[in-house]
Swiss-Prot record:
Protein name, entry field: Melanoma receptor tyrosine-protein kinase
Residues of the signal peptide: 1-25
Residues bearing attached sugar chains per UniProt: N114, N144, N201, N356, N365, N398, N417, N501, N576, N621
SS bonds (residue pairs): C195-C204, C199-C212, C220-C228, C224-C236, C237-C245, C241-C253, C256-C265, C269-C296, C300-C311, C315-C330, C333-C337, C504-C513, C508-C521, C524-C533, C537-C553, C556-C569, C560-C577, C593-C615, C618-C626, C622-C634
Chain ranges on the Cytoplasmic side, renumbered to this chain: 666-1167
GO MF annotations in UniProt: ATP binding; epidermal growth factor binding; epidermal growth factor receptor activity
Entry GO CC: basal plasma membrane; receptor complex
């Protein structure tokens, strides 16, 4: 059995400055950067690869061996022992890859995110025979490879490769990292030599005893945690070892798993701070070492910075790179940090290959670039494949503020109209922490029209080489002393620039220049004045006066007095003046002496100027300044210490006395008030209000009715708390009857229910609006009874369900307007309804709805904005989200319920959220789900409904806004609602039925309560087809009437639409839709059983005649049910005693057809 043998290899990664090509600090250990080109083929590919890896032992990044030819020598790869990233062997024709000393692949970078070792497509086919392979990889000599720390292996499309299928990869890879293994054998028959008979398990990389696979894990004893050098427990390697070992100690490792500290493998490097057990303090570690790659080093490379014990390429956000004792480190910024931007390949530009039109603006106002700057042909011409447009050369000036580049600067293309790199005129340092190709940090190639560089501020190229190639017109490059810019002896310059006509300005030193003129000098022969080399500074003459400091001309401060025969100043600032122009306070020249300036200890500083112009301090007792020394020079009153003390004591005493007096007076006032309140409470009556609120009194009138005043007819409905009857109310002392609805409470109801009914009565008695149901009176019997107006057509929900095919868009929009008007009235009265739904809206007639059911309503005071409920049964699916979750009710939560009510109307009585349990409604609303768009609604109507369902109550519309929105839509209903079919006119037969079933002495409740308003009842105006009469649905008249919700056609219409129109069309405004719960039209003497002659006889009976014949003109009823709609209506024109028919007869004025199911008042004859 063969195991690893030999002495321990003490791996010392003393990594230094260059990260480009191979460099070394120890003759036996060399480190090189590696590449990340993947499958890209570069110019001079083999030569660049040979120069990169010759003599290299450790590759920091990736080892990429690609595109080698059959006869090329790869023996320079034999020195490589460790790779930090991945190993790529692809597209090669060479027969052998001699990586015989490679022990460890760390896998810090993975190819395609999965693979650490890739061997693929290493062959070339015979052009004449596609199935015959001429050349290709035959031997992969990884003879000492024993460990891959992370990632998997891929071997595919290598038809000539031998022996690799014998390798046991599970001894090499780490199973804990879940490696991806993609091993695809090739079916091509090849002639391979077998492994040496001494190889364990017949595993080898190539024939011969020196190429057997080295096992360091699978054949170890059970006591070994990781690797071993033999089968015994004593042969286990240290836990910090990687790739095997020669002994059990951490110094016997062939490679280190984490960090190498002078030949000892550790998991961390010595930290900057340690705990001192003697002083019990955290002190600096005298043996500190910095983490650099996989090594612990005493000093970071000069072009790297130190932060938290590590060598990094750039500081993190909020940190500034500074130079301390010759070491560059990261410190927190003092104030605002200079703007640091990502370069190509870093951060936001990690997937970008060059500066282009999409990212050039990201470099605006940047001081430092973390990364690289690359400008190539695609930067300016764009890339159609990636949809990158061309870049305007003027945008390059976004780079003019850049002072430092941590990586490299590569220019492979430049605009023809720019002859220099003057956009980088402020660039001071190129760090070269990453390098281009063969280790270059500054590259200018293929820019043939470039005449000079123009990098006048460049002072340092920290690492990497410089190359200026194919720049035939470039001048002045050979005049530059590049050694002045370099920081290492290994750095070099390559250029093929012109050598003629390269005379620098006379003021430039022998270090050369970046271009013509005194502003392009690398260094000045004499002095530098603001970036311009001059012969001398303005020391004794000239303006402004200057001082010479470190070869620079520095302008004197404005407080320095200009001298003629001597220097005006010795440096910048007011402290370096030879003589002050005004006054001098110590070394500082100032325009005036300190006057009341706040100093240390929050004391004011006062000074005066003596005869020499020197500022001297005033006397300590001078509080207003002084003009000279001593107390005599003080300004203002001079107060001695004793008088000052007396004044202070007197002031304090007076303050205490005043405070005591105020406390006594307040206490006496409080005691007096308590006594007054106590006396008032003991009186039987209070003679004056103690805390007047200022609110107006509620002067609503509540009638107390006797049970004998009304009689019940039939049951309209019943519920948990009582029964509702249809009945007639006959007020005492009056010979009239009023149709009413009587709500009778059950006698067994609880006191709480009685209180809730009284609360409802209070609310209903307090409202007075055409679209809000009023309370007529209350009867306080054993079972409380509420008497309200009777709505003949029942609730709106049942109406739209039963008569879906007969309802038109104008009715729907009118109902929306009227409900919004009623709710707007309640909002103005500070009343929150809390139970608005289609079931709680009643129809007086199809053109007039009223809001009812105030069982849950709450009246808010003037300063209340919301009502907090305490539970109970509530209509969850009509409630706003905040009402469901927090039991909070506002006018805006009523807006939500209004939206659900409108949805019910537009869907003709569909159930909201049907099929969803009530307990899930809150989560459904929070997830953004809402009721769907009704089929008849256009998007305009649905958007208004959706606004009512916004989560934020303040985002929902107010009711007054909803009135305006739906009023506008009601003027043009066919534009906003799409409904098939129309509501037909009332037939004469149904009209006869309504007339014959009416009572002669029935009076409308509104007329009885408000007789002075002369309420003219609204008819139920039918929906007429768009081409029918009397009014076209989409006519200009309908769109321009004053209020589309009112039947104001008689007021607003021109007479031309009524020319030659039959009287039956204008008179048949009574709906033939009825509610069987309110009207029973099945009597045997209805219009079905009457002939036309009998009907006419009925109308000719003498009791229908009126001797007081009124000849005044008739007025169309229109929409006169609502007194607010009677704009322009003159009550005097109405008949006071009856209505004239077409045959000269009158109908009694007391006959109210509306409450017997009639849709409107009758003013024209029935033919």
């Amino acid at each position: 059995m063969e195991f690893l043998r030999g002495g321990a290899a003490l791996l010392q990664l003393l990594l230094v400055l260059s990260i480009s090509r191979c460099c070394s600090t120890d003759p036996d250990r060399k480190v090189c950067q590696g590449t990340s080109n993947q499958m890209t083929m570069l110019d001079n590919h083999y030569l660049k690869m040979k120069k990169m890896y010759s003599g290299c032992n450790v590759v920091l990044e990736n080892l990429e061996i690609t595109y080698t030819q059959e006869n090329q020598d790869l023996s320079f790869l034999q020195s490589i022992q460790e790779v930090g990233g991945y190993v790529l062997i692809a597209m090669n024709e060479v027969s052998t890859i001699p990586l015989v000393n490679l022990r460890l692949i760390r896998g810090q970078n993975l190819y395609e995110g999965n693979f650490t070792l890739l061997v693929m497509s290493n062959y070339q086919k015979n052009p004449s025979s596609p199935d015959v392979y001429q050349v290709g990889l035959k031997q992969l000599q990884l003879s000492n490879l024993t460990e891959i720390l992370s990632g998997g292996v891929k071997v595919s499309h290598n038809p000539l490769l031998c022996n690799v299928e014998t390798i046991n990869w599970w001894d090499i890879v780490d199973k804990t990292s879940n490696p991806t293994m993609n091993l695809i054998p090739h079916a091509f028959e090849r002639q391979c030599q077998k492994c040496d008979h001494g190889c364990v398990n017949g595993s080898c990389w190539a024939p011969g005893p020196g190429h057997c696979q080295k096992f360091t894990k699978l054949l170890c004893a059970e006591q070994c945690n990781r690797r071993c050098r033999g089968p015994k427990p004593i042969d286990c390697c240290n836990e910090h070892c990687a790739g095997g070992c020669t002994g059990p100690r951490a110094t016997d490792c062939l490679a280190c798993r984490d960090f190498n500290d002078d030949g000892t493998c550790k998991d961390t490097c010595p930290p900057p701070k340690i705990y001192d057990i003697v002083s019990h303090q955290v002190v600096d570690n005298p043996n500190i070492k910095y983490t650099f790659g996989a090594a612990c080093v005493k000093e970071c490379p000069s072009n790297y910075v130190v932060t938290e014990g590590a060598c990094v390429r750039s500081c993190s956000a909020g940190m500034l790179e500074v130079d301390e004792n010759g070491k560059r480190s990261c410190k927190p910024c003092d104030g605002v940090c200079p703007k640091v931007c990502d370069g190509i390949g870093i951060g936001s530009l990690s997937n970008t290959i060059a500066v282009n039109s999409t990212n050039i603006r990201s470099f605006s106002n940047c001081t430092k670039i973390n990364g690289d700057i690359i400008l190539n042909r695609n930067s300016f011409e764009g890339d159609p494949h990636y949809k990158i447009g061309t870049m305007d050369p003027e945008h390059l000036w976004n780079l003019t503020t850049v002072k430092e580049i941590t990586g490299y600067l590569v220019i492979m293309w430049w605009p023809e109209n720019m002859t220099s790199l003057s956009v980088f005129q402020n660039l001071e340092i190129i760090r070269g922490r990453t390098t281009f190709s063969r280790g270059f940090s500054f590259v200018v190639v293929q820019v043939r029209h470039l005449q000079w560089l123009g990098l006048r501020s460049l002072k340092e190229v920290s690492a990497g080489n410089v190359i200026l190639k194919n720049t035939l017109q470039l001048r002045y490059a050979n005049t530059i002393n590049w050694r002045r810019l370099f920081r290492s002896e290994d750095q070099s310059i390559e250029y093929d620039a012109r050598t003629e006509n390269q005379t620098c300005n006379n003021e430039c030193s022998e270090d050369g220049c970046w271009g013509p003129g005194p502003t392009m000098c690398v260094s000045c022969l004499h002095v530098d004045r603001g970036g311009r080399c001059v012969a001398s500074c303005n020391l004794l003459q000239g303006e402004p006066r200057e001082a010479q400091v470190d070869g620079r001309c520095v302008q004197c401060h404005q407080e320095c007095l200009v001298q003629t025969d001597s220097l005006t100043c010795y440096g910048p600032g007011p402290a370096n003046c030879s003589k002050s122009a005004h006054f001098q306070d110590g070394p500082q020249c100032i325009p005036r002496c300190p006057h009341g300036i706040l100093g240390d200890g929050d004391t004011l500083i006062w000074k005066y100027a003596d005869k020499m112009g020197q500022c001297q301090p005033c006397h300590q007792n001078c509080t207003q300044g002084c003009s000279g020394p001593g107390l005599s020079g003080c300004r203002g009153d001079i107060v001695s210490h004793s008088s000052l003390a007396v004044g202070l004591v007197s002031g304090l005493l007076i303050t205490v006395i005043v405070a005591l007096l105020i406390v006594v007076l307040l206490r006496r006032r409080r005691i007096k008030r308590k006594r007054t309140i106590r006396c008032l409470l003991q009186e039987k009556e209070l003679v004056e209000p103690l805390t007047p609120s200022g609110q107006a009194p509620n002067q609503a009138f509540l009638r107390i009715l006797k049970e004998t005043e009304f009689k019940k007819d039939r049951v309209l409905g019943s519920g948990a708390f009582g029964t509702v009857y249809k009945g007639l109310w006959n007020p005492d002392g009056e010979n009239i009857r009023i149709p009413v609805a009587i709500k009778v409470l059950r006698e067994a109801t609880s006191p709480k229910v009685n209180q809730e009914v009284l609360d409802e009565a209070y609310v209903m008695a307090s409202v007075d609006h055409p679209h809000v149901c009023r309370l007529l009176g209350i009867c306080l019997t054993s079972a409380v009874q509420l008497v309200t107006q009777l709505m003949p057509y029942g609730c709106l929900l049942d109406y739209v369900r039963q008569h879906q095919e007969r309802i038109c868009g104008q009715w729907l929009l009118n109902w929306c307007v009227q409900i919004a008007k009623g709710m707007n009235y309640l909002e103005e009265r500070h009343l929150v309804h809390r139970d608005l739904a289609a079931r709680n809206v009643l129809l007086k007639n199809p053109n007039h709805v009223k809001i009812t059911d105030f069982g849950l309503s709450k009246l808010l005071t003037a300063d209340e904005k919301e009502y907090q409920a305490d539970g109970g049964k509530v209509p969850i699916k009509w409630m706003a989200l905040e009402s469901i979750l927090q039991w909070t009710y506002t006018h805006q939560s009523d807006v939500w319920s209004y939206g659900v009510t409108v949805w019910e109307l537009m869907t003709f009585g569909s159930k909201p959220y049907d099929g969803i349990p009530a307990k899930e409604i809150a989560s459904v609303l929070e997830n953004g789900e809402r009721l769907p768009q009704p089929p008849i609604c256009t998007i305009e109507v649905y958007m208004i409904i959706l606004k009512c369902w916004m989560i934020d109550p303040s985002s929902r519309p107010r009711f007054r806004e909803l009135v305006g929105e739906f009023s506008q839509m009601a003027r043009d209903p066919s534009r906003y609602l799409v409904i098939q079919g129309n509501l037909p006119s009332l037939s004469d037969r149904r009209l006869f039925s309504r007339l014959l079933s009416s009572d002669d002495d029935v009076v409308d409740a509104d007329e009885y309560l408000l007789p002075y308003k002369r309420i003219n009842r609204q008819g139920s105006e039918p929906c007429i087809p768009p081409t029918g009469h009397p009014v076209r649905e989409n006519s200009i008249t309908l769109r321009n009437i004053s209020d589309p919700t009112q039947n104001a056609l008689e007021k607003d219409l021109d007479g031309h639409e009524y020319v030659n129109q039959p009287g039956s069309e204008t008179s048949s405004r009574l709906s033939d839709i009825y509610n069987p719960n309110y009207e029973d039209l099945t009597d045997g003497w209805g219009p079905v059983s009457l002939s036309s002659q009998e009907a006419e006889t009925n109308f000719s009976r003498p009791e229908y005649l009126n001797t007081n014949q009124n000849s005044l003109p008739l007025v169309s009823s229109g929409s006169m049910d609502d007194p607010d709609y009677q704009a322009g209506y003159q009550a005097a024109f109405l008949p006071q005693t009856g209505a004239l028919t077409g045959n000269g007869m009158f109908l009694p004025a007391a006959e109210n057809l509306e409450y017997l199911g009639q849709g409107g008042a009758l003013y024209t004859p029935v033919r």
